UniProtKB/Swiss-Prot annotation:
It comes from Kineococcus radiotolerans (strain ATCC BAA-149 / DSM 14245 / SRS30216). Keywords: Cell membrane, Membrane, Transmembrane, Transmembrane helix. Belongs to the UPF0060 family. This is UPF0060 membrane protein Krad_3114. Its main location: membrane. It is found in: Cell membrane. InterPro entries: UPF0060. The chain crosses the membrane at residues 7-27, 33-53, 62-82, 88-108.
Amino acid sequence: MDVLRSIALFVLAALLEIGGAWLVWQGVREHRGLAWIGAGVIALGLYGFAATLQPEAQFGRVLAAYGGVFVAGSLLWAAVVDGYRPDRFDVAGALVCLVGVGIVMYAPRPS
């Protein structure tokens, strides 16, 4: 059950961080205004709290593993929201990152 909770928290963190960064990008680069930037900053702040909810106690392990989730999530966000079409190297790289997440977070370790 901890693994499912952990995965759900990684998804939440990705939505908050990637979504927040996207909102800031839209506000600044696409000139959509301060409301977009403000919403992005709030989402990015909430992302910081999402990581603290992980069942794993080691900050470095959680953030290192989240980096792999961020890579895959960013490509997925770009495909769904911005119409970006990842190529086979994008997909392969994202899959490698997700395998790394699995190893870093969920490999059996001695107690």
